[in-house]
Amino acid sequence: CALVLCDEFRTDVEPMDSGDDSAYRKIHDRFIRKRVENLGKEPVKRKGYIQPCGADDNDTDAAKKTSYFENIREAIEKLHENHHVIDKKTKKRVSFGVVRVANITPCVKVSLYLMKCGWSEGTAVRVMTYHSRQILLLRHEQERYLDKVFTRKTQSATVDFQDETVRKHLDSTPEENIIFILVATPVEEVGRDHDFDWAVVE
């Protein structure tokens, strides 16, 4: 038998007797130590944190859902604060993010909650729901639009937004903070190369 371990740095093939747990552990641990060492030499590409969810085990299901959705809202505001850009024309703080949930029903419920809940003063949100059960024509148009808007190659802190729909929202919204939120299921990950300012991932 042989054990094959691979990552983005290398592939190791080690001879090993079938069922030899101690040999497997030794080879695997050596591979992981080398991987951690290699990753430590790479530049940091993304940073993340775990958002605490304060639901109590004694809460009702409805209270747990509300608490969960509220934690998502709080994370969005925090991420917007840290990762927004400035619109060149209006000087408003703008961010584009994704809330990625596992299933369609929670995707729709999170979207509805984010559209109806209270946000900090001076904050407006625009929410789009994106999942695989949408009417195909709608989904096709959504995907075309998302591919256009989220193919952003600029790293500038000030952006001159040209998209007609985005521009309309920026020009007509009185709030100084505008957060564009895509609430999506894993369909967002299939063949998409979108550039978001932030993400909340279930």
Which role fits each region the language model picked out?
Residues 1-2, 202:
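Conserved helicase ATPase motor motifs in RecA-like P-loop NTPase domains
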Residues 2, 123-125, 195-197:
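Short glycine-/polar-rich loops that comprise or flank the Walker A/P-loop
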Residues 2-67:
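Interdomain hinge/linker at the junction between the two RecA-like core domains of SF2 helicases
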Residues 48-182:
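Conserved C-terminal RecA-like helicase domain
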Residues 174, 188-190:
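A cross-taxonomic marker for long C-terminal extensions/tails that follow the last structured domain
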Residues 183-187, 200-202:
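Conserved helicase core region in the C-terminal RecA-like lobe
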Residues 192-202:
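A short beta-strand element within the Helicase C-terminal
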